[in-house]
């Protein structure tokens, strides 16, 4: 699961105020110092990891990895999980609503291992058809990579339905 709202969405006032306070009075590198502020920042960072782990029902806090953004996260998944778990006969499904950060890593993986990329079409409003998705997914599909809310088209994709179908077919 990857969650990202930092790239192009508005921030709640309390988030802006909290960040302002941190930058003005508490900022220090995480896990990079032995001084008080660094220890406090590191503790808050790990506290956030624990809260996310609990929210997502992760077995261990260490299952939660923070990255700088979407591009880094998708590249990490493609170059680690993708490279280890996909082969020449496997498929990746994406949609036409995707940002380049969710296209190029899969294209690079395809060049490296020979897997296939299938693209779910979108209608004139930028929505995907569940029927079209179901026609494209198969037991060869190992990864379904799509945005929940497209910052390219502004559409909301049916994440629960797509995830259920993906899991039913053995894909992540």
What is each residue range found by the language model?
Residues 1-172:
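Pyridoxal 5′-phosphate
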């Amino acid at each position: 699961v990857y969650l990202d709202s930092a790239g192009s969405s508005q921030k709640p006032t309390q988030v802006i105020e909290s960040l302002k306070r941190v930058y003005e009075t508490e900022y220090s590198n995480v896990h990079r110092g032995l001084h008080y502020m660094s220890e406090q920042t590191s503790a808050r960072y790990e506290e956030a990891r624990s809260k996310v782990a609990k929210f997502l029902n992760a077995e261990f806090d260490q299952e939660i990895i923070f990255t700088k953004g979407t591009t880094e996260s998708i590249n990490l998944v493609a170059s680690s999980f993708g490279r280890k778990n996909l082969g020449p006969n496997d498929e990746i499904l994406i949609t036409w609503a995707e940002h380049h950060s969710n296209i190029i890593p899969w294209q690079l993986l395809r060049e490296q291992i020979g897997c296939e990329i299938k693209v779910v079409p979108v209608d004139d409003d930028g929505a995907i058809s569940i029927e079209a998705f179901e026609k494209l997914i198969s037991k060869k599909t190992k990864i379904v990579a799509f945005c929940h809310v497209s910052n390219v088209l502004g559409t909301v994709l049916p994440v629960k339905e797509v995830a259920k179908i993906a899991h039913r077919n053995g894909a992540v």
